[in-house]
């Protein structure tokens, strides 16, 4: 089985695949202080919770933005005698990139592009709501060509609470109205509905620039479900898109030999 790992700045998403089938998925906080020992213990706990055996994992594929944790995950792979592969330059042969600097494109964005083309077809636009909000554009030939990066919803809310003396931190949840009735609801509207409106505006412009109004729009990331309640801009909400892309890249690498 393959364990696909998407290491974000805030959360680490994991998916266990048996071939192309997603057997189980988990999320845990991304903690840069974690050692291989701590990661191993957490993994054993997740697997035990669902009656799964860590011994069944014969490969681990990583995509992430936290280099020091990649080293710890490699150590875990060694412990369980699993092959390890990192999404990056070594997997370039099975990905399609037309960005100005392909080597600088984040591994999670590459995985999103691969999954979007594979499972939903091209052209496509992926809106990934995580620590940052990433928008990735895949052209009609299936190539990643670029996109946009904006501050994530939680970053924006935390900055507002930190810099505005009378505005406290509020729960991150979708408001019921577009017109806030009190300060807390106003912050939710500005943050969540504002993120939805930003996505709507950027997606509309990108579709025009592509010349393809029919591009499939996919929302993913840990906060996609919250934002999706405030907009009809998304054709698909797939919270597992990135780990599915990691699995697909691994499968292609195996076929390549």
Locate the predicted segments by residue.
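Conserved phosphate-binding catalytic cores of ATP/NTP-utilizing and phosphoryl-transfer enzymes
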Residues: 93-124, 247-255
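Short beta-strand scaffold segments in enzyme catalytic cores
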Residues: 12-16, 126, 133-138
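ATP-binding/phosphotransfer module of carbohydrate and carboxylate kinases, centering on a glycine-rich
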Residues: 2-4, 30, 156-257
């Amino acid at each position: 089985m393959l364990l696909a790992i998407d290491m974000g700045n805030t959360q680490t998403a994991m998916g266990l695949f048996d071939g192309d089938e997603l057997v189980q998925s988990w999320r845990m906080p991304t903690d840069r202080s974690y050692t291989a020992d701590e990661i191993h213990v957490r993994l054993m706990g997740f697997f035990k919770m669902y009656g799964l055996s860590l011994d069944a994992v014969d490969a681990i594929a990583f995509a992430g933005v936290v280099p020091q944790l990649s080293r710890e995950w490699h150590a875990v792979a060694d412990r369980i005698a699993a092959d390890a592969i990192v999404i990056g330059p070594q997997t370039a042969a099975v990905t399609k990139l037309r960005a100005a600097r392909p080597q600088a494109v984040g591994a999670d964005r590459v995985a999103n592009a691969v999954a979007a083309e594979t499972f939903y077809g091209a052209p496509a636009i992926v809106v990934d709501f995580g620590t940052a909000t990433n928008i990735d554009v895949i052209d009609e030939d299936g190539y990643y060509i670029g996109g946009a990066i904006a501050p994530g919803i939680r970053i924006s809310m935390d900055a507002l609470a930190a810099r505005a003396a009378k505005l406290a931190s509020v729960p991150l949840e979708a408001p019921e109205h577009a017109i806030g009735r009190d300060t807390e609801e106003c912050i939710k509207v500005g943050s969540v509905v504002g993120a939805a409106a930003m996505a709507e505006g950027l997606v509309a412009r990108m579709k025009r620039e592509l010349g393809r109004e029919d591009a499939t729009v996919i929302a993913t990331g840990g906060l996609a479900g919250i934002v999706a309640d405030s907009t009809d801009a998304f054709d698909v909400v797939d919270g597992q898109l990135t780990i599915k892309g990691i699995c697909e890249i691994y499968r292609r690498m195996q076929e390549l030999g």
